Design a protein with these regions (language model features):
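Bacterial N-terminal signal peptides that target proteins for export
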Residues: 1-10
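Start-of-domain marker
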Residues: 26-67
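Stable alpha-helical elements in mature extracytoplasmic
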Residues: 36, 43, 47, 69-70, ...
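Residues that form generic nucleotide/phosphate-binding pockets
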Residues: 39, 50, 87, 91, ...
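Generic structural signal for well-ordered, non-membrane alpha-helices
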Residues: 42-52, 82, 86, 119-123, ...
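Short, contiguous alpha-helical
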Residues: 61-110, 154-207
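A charged, solvent-exposed segment within the mature domains of Sec-exported extracytoplasmic proteins
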Residues: 118-184
Length: 207
């Protein structure tokens, strides 16, 4: 009888302190987790594979003076990965604001397509202009990108945080922090497309 009572007390204690995993678990759904992780992995591989086996001439080629080279696209992708994740962490540390969810006007899929749409041209913020990222070689940028993306995927695999109820106001409208994760992946795809446009240019060096 005493053992049974002690067992119940221990279980109650675990639940109250959250160690039993039933409190403060505001996880995204399995479907949402799978979608975000899949997008993170797919867009990571696309970006890295698009830079393989290129010469210095190919990495530095610009279709026009004001255009970015392959190397500069990769600098921007890697720099934005850190900047956007910093934004994500900052907003997750703040108070949840579920009352702002009504301000979100796009589904996850619509938002990803919007970010990836290259017909909608935008000016990159100064801190993630290629010249301001601090990278000195494409190898350095790729390694930094791989490391950070790996950490972000690891977070998404295990996080129980309430991403949906941390809502962020962006220049284009309101999104939640789960969608901000999707934005990180979609953004790298957007600029991988740009990188591939450079490679498809008629003047791109053959070697």
């Amino acid at each position: 009888m005493l053992k049974r009572t002690m067992g119940r007390l221990l279980l109650t204690s675990l639940v109250i302190t959250g160690l039993a995993g039933t409190i403060d678990d505001n996880s995204i759904s399995k479907k949402e987790r799978k979608y975000a992780i899949g997008l993170m992995k797919e867009t990571r591989d696309e970006a890295i594979n698009s830079t393989k086996n290129l010469s210095e001439a190919q990495l530095n080629y610009k279709a026009a003076p004001e255009k970015w080279s392959v190397k500069e696209c990769m600098y921007h992708i890697a720099g934005a990965e850190k900047l956007l994740w910093g934004m994500f962490e900052s907003n997750m540390k703040g108070a949840a604001n579920p009352e702002k969810r009504s301000e979100i006007k796009v589904t996850d899929e619509q938002f990803v397509k919007m970010v990836q749409d290259r017909s909608n041209k935008l000016q990159a913020p100064e801190p993630i202009q290629p010249k301001n990222t601090g990278f000195t070689s494409i190898t350095e940028a790729i390694e930094d990108f791989k490391k950070n993306r790996g950490e972000h995927i690891k977070y998404l695999k295990s996080s129980t945080e309430d991403m949906r109820n941390h809502v962020v106001q962006m220049p284009f409208g309101w999104i939640d922090c789960y969608q901000l994760c999707l934005m990180i992946a979609a953004h790298s795809n957007r600029h991988t497309q740009q990188l591939n446009e450079v490679k498809a240019d008629a003047g791109f060096p053959k070697q």
